[in-house]
UniProtKB/Swiss-Prot annotation:
Gene this protein is translated from: betI
Coiled-coil regions listed: none
Role noted for this protein: Repressor involved in the biosynthesis of the osmoprotectant glycine betaine. It represses transcription of the choline transporter BetT and the genes of BetAB involved in the synthesis of glycine betaine.
Pathways per UniProt: Amine and polyamine biosynthesis; betaine biosynthesis via choline pathway [regulation]
The HTH tetR-type domain, residue ranges: 8-68
Protein name, per record: HTH-type transcriptional regulator BetI
DNA-binding region: 31-50
PANTHER family reported for this sequence: HTH-TYPE TRANSCRIPTIONAL REGULATOR BETI, HTH-TYPE TRANSCRIPTIONAL REGULATOR RUTR
Single annotated GO MF: transcription cis-regulatory region binding
């Protein structure tokens, strides 16, 4: 008989275990049994909650995106100026929960998987559109809409690129350095603007 109220806790444990397992292996070449073992639950329970590896992977991506969105909304809520909003968007993308070694490796794996999975590709497109629209909203208060869109596209590419570089490197991710690079890029692009 399942314990009442345990499902959300077990789901979260499995999602966290999926991030760790995928991050450690650097690929989606993992089994539900390996993820379940990492979470300390039975493979049958993992299948019961998620119905299979693909659904567990998608739930893991959704979790990371939801966490990013919640952190972003909280950070933006504390800003007063467009430049503060831009800084908050950048900082959240390199927060400790997102820019950890295993999470970075998991994100890189999701990008590779998107070439074969329409569901994964759709989630990554949603992420890219949200990042772009959040940046454009703040940037167009400082420059033209056309320039704001181009600057946002460049900043998004830098953020993704820094994830890729850190996924391939042996050193621990340096969030402060990554934030400074993206902020410097935007500052240079805005020189001479309002």
């Amino acid at each position: 008989m399942p314990k009442i109220g345990m499902e959300p806790l077990r789901r979260r444990e499995l999602i966290d275990a999926a991030i760790r397992t995928i991050g450690q292996r650097g690929s989606l070449d993992v089994t539900v049994a390996q993820i379940a073992h990492e979470a300390g639950v039975s493979p049958a329970l993992a299948h019961h909650y998620f119905g299979g590896k693909d659904k567990l992977i998608l739930a893991t991506m959704r979790h990371l995106l939801r966490e990013l969105g919640q952190d972003l909304n909280a950070a933006i809520g504390r800003t007063e100026t467009p430049r503060e909003r831009i800084a908050a968007i950048i900082a959240v993308n390199f927060s400790a929960s997102q820019f950890a070694q295993e999470t970075i490796a998991a994100w890189l794996t999701f990008y590779v998987h998107a070439q074969q999975s329409e569901d994964t590709r759709r989630l990554l497109r949603i992420y890219a559109r949200r990042l772009h629209s959040n940046l454009v909203f703040a940037l167009e208060q400082l420059t033209s809409r056309e320039r704001a869109s181009r600057i946002a596209e460049g900043a998004g590419a830098m953020i993704d690129g820094l994830y890729i570089r850190h996924a391939l490197g042996a050193d621990a991710p340096n969030a402060a350095s990554a934030i400074a690079l993206v902020e410097d890029y935007i500052a240079v692009q805005l020189m001479g603007e309002k």
